[in-house]
């Protein structure tokens, strides 16, 4: 069970930590520590319509994006401590993504707990263990390998 309230609240606007535009910023609130744990919360609704299925439910794969944005908050806090702003990161892969429910409904509040297993400030990928909760029930789990390039232009087309 996730004791969400035991994790200190982050009093920084999420737009100051994540590079997504408001239309793609899926998380409502975040919590984190000076250590290796970060957590987020979101209530599913119309702004998550990109992930909606024809019947109005949200496929369990939305958990991967919520986990990725939670990890982005962790990276955003690190970047902010170093004096820089939000940076784009990539999911390189996932191990053992286990969704315990096939879908979610509008109004469901999902909480994500991410723990940094390995964080590299050099040009290496990092790993996070993430767990998703709906109420007290664990509804998903994954280990994500992520990468935040120092120079994003090395991965984009020349202008």
For every predicted segment, state its role.
Residues 8-14, 111-113:
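Short Pro/Gly-enriched beta-strand edge/turn motifs at strand-loop
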Residues 1-11, 41:
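Single-stranded RNA-binding regions, centering on S1/OB-family and related RNA-binding modules
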Residues 55-74, 88-92:
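Compact, glycine-rich, soluble single-domain proteins
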